[in-house]
Amino acid sequence: MIKQTIVALLLSVGASSVFAAGTVKVFSNGSSEAKTLTGAEHLIDLVGQPRLANSWWPGAVISEELATAAALRQQQALLTRLAEQGADSSADDAAAINALRQQIQALKVTGRQKINLDPDIVRVAERGNPPLQGNYTLWVGPPPSTVTLFGLISRPGKQPFTPGRDVASYLSDQSLLSGADRSYAWVVYPDGRTQKAPVAYWNKRHVEPMPGSIIYVGLADSVWSETPDALNADILQTLTQRIPQ
């Protein structure tokens, strides 16, 4: 009887371990083809892989299947809200909103998990090595060499990263579209953090983005009466869930 109980317990533990293990698709170094890792029971089983040893972890992104579905729904809801906002606006404002909407529509988003992926942190941090259950996708690669300008500006897109250059300097050659915030921009760092950066002559502060950051020029409170803060927050959330390029 005791022997049967021990065997049953071992089978139960084994089944539990198999159930808990995650399956991860890994995109590395800009490859369009994923390599699949199975049986990853904890995060360190993934980020501790020798083949990922030279990855740039500040910009790495791991997503979970259900969270990705939610992120895609949020992106679509945001696009709908912007379309409605544009339909109720003047010609100049509508053109600006449409330009912003097109940029957001072009984004590829995923259900990013908010956790530090640096293997050294994963090994030692409290709750830094959670179990992996379900289906995940990991994007890792080398350090980027650009920043991305985004939002209500004349020429959105990538710019070469320059050490020491601040947010206001990156925006100095841009024309702002109708309804743009002229006093502040936002920095979305590669690790998902966001920071509000004063950029006007009266409040300018030296804020340096790191390589791989997005500089977002959003909607101005003084121009938009329909909850610009909520729209800006949702846009920033979508930007934090962008798949690394």
Swiss-Prot record:
UniProt keywords (A-Z) are: Signal
Show the InterPro entries listed in the entry.
Answer: Caps_syn_GfcC_N (IPR046459), Caps_synth_GfcC-like_C (IPR010425)
Q: What Gene3D superfamilies does the record point to?
A: 3.10.20.700, Outer membrane lipoprotein wza domain like (3.10.560.10)
Give the range the annotation lists for the signal sequence. Answer: 1-20
Query: What's the family?
Result: To E.coli YmcB.
Could you identify this protein by its name? Uncharacterized protein YjbG
Query: Which organism is this protein's natural source?
Result: Escherichia coli (strain K12)
> What is the phylogenetic placement of the source species in the record?
Bacteria, Pseudomonadati, Pseudomonadota, Gammaproteobacteria, Enterobacterales
The protein's gene is named yjbG
